[in-house]
Amino acid sequence: MPTISEDLIRRRAEHNNCEIFSLEEISLHQQDLERIEHIDKWCRELKILYLQNNLIGKIENVSKLKKLEYLNLALNNIEKIENLEGCESLQKLDLTVNFVGELSSINSLQENLHLRELYLVGNPCAEYEGYRQYVVATLPQLKWLDGKEIERSERIQALQDYPQVQGRMKEQQEAYLRKRAAEREEARSKLQGKQKESRKTQEKKPGFDRRWYTDINNTIPDPVEKPDPTEQNGDETALRKAEEEEEKEFWSQPSQYTPESRLETHRYLEEKRKSKESSSEGELKKKPPRTLITAEGRVLNVNESKLDFSLVDDEENNQFVLDLAIYRHLDTSLVDVDVQPSYIKVLVKEKPFQLVLPAEVKPDSSSAKRSQTTGHLVVTMPKAIGVIQTKRAKSPVVEEQTRKNPPKCSKTFEKLEVDPKACSVPDFANIVQEKKTQAQGPLQFHKNKVKDTEDSEDFIDNTDVPPLM
């Protein structure tokens, strides 16, 4: 039976950093809870509490929640409203689809002065004649009942008709309580009958007859007979058919909607779930182990993980090199390597990889390395029987390279002794040459060079005359 534990509350308090002492809202719906416990001690600051769709049969252990404003107990097995007097700040109470038949128990809510909303839809008491008038007259602080606002005229009318409504309500309540007592007795007798049937079925099983047989003289144990696989398969099919018939009978059997029937259905489903889990675990356990070596001693090649691999025969170094493509992000602690003289076995997450080697190797001289970039496992295994081989003469690669790529000569200038007279000195005056003007355009105009004219013999330079610009 699931219970309210500290671990459950902390998991449901992720929005509050998993702190439960300062928790103001928590949802514990659909947890198959049958009791309310520990919440009033661990979560004193609670304001909103969701407990809908469980198997709670009694309101308890909430009286210390002084700040609780909203309590949702819909879809449970509650039959009586009680133990809510200590919830001083309670404003909304939801008891939709429960088994509240004792309507007089709402008198305990008169002390909850801040109660404004109450939901009793889907309860047996909601079918009583005069149910709404009785609740409105009994709880004057209510503003909403079953999602409908209580008007002032409705309250006045309910207070006027309260004596007659109270009498009719008591009669209907007593009739319902007698009916509930009969249902409880019927459920109890039904449960006892099922227990007796289960005991009988256990006693009918082979190997048990309530007696013990001892023979002092007979000390030789009986030989163990191996079960016949055909008989075993037949027993399994018969057992499955019996379970299917039992399940069909359970769901086809008519039953009343009572707290006991809800509990019975829940426990039946829980047993079925546990049996399926146990059967699945049994099937997993029954899985035969992988055969790596036959009874004759022959080693098999196995690659259960379906990993890519390559085995290279390095003749120059006289060794085998195995490259196994292990997953890159797999932790090395999950890899186990075992090198034997004739084969190698690698366990990757408990899944074997086994490979038979072409020749014997030295296990003590072998080494295993793993790449940090690709994650591949490289196992180097020297051969046990060494073969003396002459090393191949290295081809003159250097000479060919020198022929193809001759060495570059150094960039040093060699100077010769030359007669200085034979050396022509450059004319520094003619370094910049005048650009010749070329014809431009279709008319080919030419710019004539201006030549300096010589002065005539009778030219007199008069200083008073300004120069021509």
Swiss-Prot record:
InterPro entries: CS_DNAAF11_C, Leu-rich_rpt, LRR_dom_sf, U2A'_phosphoprotein32A_C. Disulfide bonds: none annotated. This is Dynein axonemal assembly factor 11. Residues 114-135 form the LRRCT domain. GO terms for cellular component: cytoplasm; cytosol; dynein axonemal particle; extracellular region; motile cilium. Keywords: Cell projection, Cilium, Coiled coil, Cytoplasm, Flagellum, Leucine-rich repeat, Repeat. LRR repeats lie at residues 20-43, 44-65, 66-89, 90-110. It is found in: Cytoplasm; Cell projection, Cilium; Dynein axonemal particle; Cell projection, Cilium, Flagellum. SMART domains: LRR_SD22, LRRcap. The lineage of its organism: Eukaryota, Metazoa, Chordata, Craniata, Vertebrata. The keyword Transmembrane helix does not apply. It comes from the Eukaryota. The gene is dnaaf11. Pfam families: CS_DNAAF11_C (PF23602), LRR_9 (PF14580). GO terms for biological process: axonemal dynein complex assembly; cerebrospinal fluid circulation; epithelial cilium movement involved in determination of left/right asymmetry; epithelial cilium movement involved in extracellular fluid movement; establishment of localization in cell; flagellated sperm motility; outer dynein arm assembly; protein localization to cilium. Belongs to the tilB family. Involved in dynein arm assembly, is important for expression and transporting outer dynein arm (ODA) proteins from the cytoplasm to the cilia. Residues 179-290, 436-469 are annotated as: Disordered. Residues 179-213, 261-286 have a biased composition (Basic and acidic residues).
